[in-house]
């Protein structure tokens, strides 16, 4: 890699690649999230992490009919939709990525890139969640998640990010 102290950014038709020393990340426009994390040749993700709003019911939930009162969050959890993507590279918003601009831009390097996805729930009334991934030259990813609640929504069972990733096994050797 020509600039080992910079991120190499690759704009694709459906993805944005961010590459550095020992890591490769792919952000999907179509899937609406971080699609691939490869560190030292090992793939960590099975699919894009997404906001989650639902949890397993307890007996108390069933007794109080919580699942009836807050059931719209189960639908929001299953059918969340990505409505927008924003890419900021070294503090400047980028308009270069597809599908708005499908021309090849040549080699692009950056010190930091922030990819923000705006998700919209199918609740009534609807609300939004912003998920931002900030990548620096060391390969660290900072994830910021912001839920924008609105009046009139039922009680929220849980809020977080759900991720499918490969298991990690650590073997410790003690003499």
Predicted features, each with a name:
Residues 1-175:
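Beta-strand/loop-rich accessory regions of lumenal/periplasmic or secreted enzymes
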């Amino acid at each position: 890699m020509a600039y080992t102290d910079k991120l190499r950014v690759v704009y694709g038709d459906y993805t944005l690649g961010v590459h550095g020393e020992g890591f490769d990340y792919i952000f999907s426009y179509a899937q609406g999230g971080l699609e691939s994390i490869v560190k030292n040749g090992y793939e960590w993700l099975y699919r894009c992490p997404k906001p989650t709003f639902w949890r397993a019911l307890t007996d108390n939930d069933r007794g109080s009919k919580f699942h009836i009162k807050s059931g719209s969050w189960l639908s929001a959890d299953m059918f969340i939709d990505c409505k927008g993507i924003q890419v900021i590279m070294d503090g400047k918003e980028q308009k270069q990525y597809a599908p708005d601009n499908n021309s090849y831009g040549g080699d692009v390097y950056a010190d930091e890139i922030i990819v923000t996805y705006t998700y919209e729930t199918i609740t009534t009334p609807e609300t939004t969640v912003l998920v931002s991934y900030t990548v620096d030259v060391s390969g660290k990813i900072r994830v910021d998640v912001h839920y924008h609640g609105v009046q009139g929504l039922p009680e929220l069972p849980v809020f977080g990010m759900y991720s499918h990733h490969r298991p990690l096994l650590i073997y410790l050797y003690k003499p």
